[in-house]
Amino acid sequence: TYPVSEKMRTTSDYTQEFVFTKDISEGYDHEVTLDLLPGNYNVMVWSDLVQTSGDSHFHNADNFAEIRLQGDHKGNNDYRDAFRGSNNISLVADIMEHLPDTLDIAMQRPLAKFEFVTNDVVEFIDKESVRVASKANGNKAASTDDTPTRAVNIEDYKVVFYYVGFMPDAYSMNTDKPVDSSTGVMFESTLRKLSESEATMGFDYVFVNGKKSAVTVQIGIYDNEGTQLSLTEPIEVPLKRSHHTIMTGMFLMSEASGGVTINPDFDGDHNLIFP
C-alpha cells in the first residue's frame, strides 16, 4: 500500500507491505484481509507463480519501480506468467462498529506470449533420414532406394531462440511499462509434435506496455551432436499485452522471410502465418 498521491508515491517508501501465497489449483481469485490505519491508500498488487512451494521466483519484485527477471533466462515455462493491479481506497476513523471496507482489484498481465509452430515436420524428417543414413554410411551417397526410414525422432533436436537486439527484462508498477532491457538473451527448447505435419518449437513471455509492441528473434536448429542445421533470418514478432501470438511457417526447412497474414478470428490470440 502506498500514499494515494502519485507524487508522494514516487518519492516515498510504501506504507505497508503484505505477502500472500495461494494454490492456484483452487482458482486465481484471492480474498485477503489487511489491517490498515485510517487514510487514503493506493493499493498495488503484483502476483507471480512458482511450480512448488520454496521454488525461486522468476521475478524479483522487491522494488515495485523495477520488477526484474532474475537468474538465467528460461523460456517454455508457463510459470513465467504474472499479473498486476492497483486501486485506491479511503479509510476513515469511525468509532461506530461497521462492516470492513472492501476493495476489488482487477489483475491484468503486463506480458505478452509468443509461440512458434512449424508445419514442415514431414519434409524435415525425410531430409534428416537421408542425411543421417548417408552419415552412417561414411558420408557415401544414400542407397538407390531413397525412401526415408523415418527413424528420426524430432525430440532429439534442439531449438535455440536468439533475441536480436533488446529483450525487455524489467517492469515498473508505477508507470505500468517496461523500464529496462538486455541484449544477448537466448533460450533453448525442443520440438514437440502437434500432428503429423506440425510441431511447436517453443514459446516465451515478454514485458510489454499497453500498446502494440514487437521483439525480433532468430531460431537455430541443432542435432544431438550440436551441429547447427539451420538458422532463420531475423523474424519480427508482433506482441500485444495479454495476447498469445502464434507464428506458423516452414521454420525447419527454410529461412523465414516475407510477409505475414493475421487471422482475426481468435479472441486473445494472433495467428501469423508465413507464406
Where do the model's predicted regions map?
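Intrinsically disordered, low-complexity repeat and linker tracts
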Residues: 250-275
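Structured interaction patches on ligand/partner-binding surfaces of diverse proteins
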Residues: 19-24, 51-102, 184-194, 225-254
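Short strand-edge motifs at loop-to-beta-strand transitions and within beta-strands
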Residues: 30-32, 101-105
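Tryptophan-paired
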Residues: 1-57, 126-239, 272-275
